Curated annotation (Swiss-Prot):
Transmembrane segments: none annotated. This is Ubiquinol-cytochrome c reductase complex assembly factor 2. Pfam families: UQCC2_CBP6 (PF20180). GO terms for cellular component: mitochondrial inner membrane; mitochondrial intermembrane space; mitochondrial matrix; mitochondrial nucleoid; mitochondrion; nuclear body. Pancreas, skeletal muscle, kidney, liver and heart. Its main location: mitochondrion. The gene is UQCC2. The lineage of its organism: Eukaryota, Metazoa, Chordata, Craniata, Vertebrata.
Amino acid sequence: MAASRYRRFLKLCEEWPVDETKRGRDLGAYLRQRVAQAFREGENTQVAEPEACDQMYESLARLHSNYYKHKYPRPRDTSFSGLSLEEYKLILSTDTLEELKEIDKGMWKKLQEKFAPKGPEEDHKA
């Protein structure tokens, strides 16, 4: 039975897309990591809580198949801000978020980072 659970999770991982713009924050990448941890021995892994494992799979499968999108359809594909899906993807990308963090830093902090000596003592203080 564990082998079939493992194969179902692998199939779900293959179908789940990975968004490269969200490095370290992507659900597809996280899902692959968790499946690798949970099934370390592959098909030979013994599942401690089979009911919880099956429930987790069913929940993820419903998300992947857009079950809730079809169950609760929206009359229009809009958001409160009026931005399009592509604009949201751009804003939520890791690169854009890093740029915003850099912009949010004050001038004094930027100067400190630029001119502060980087020595072994400095690393231990932080």
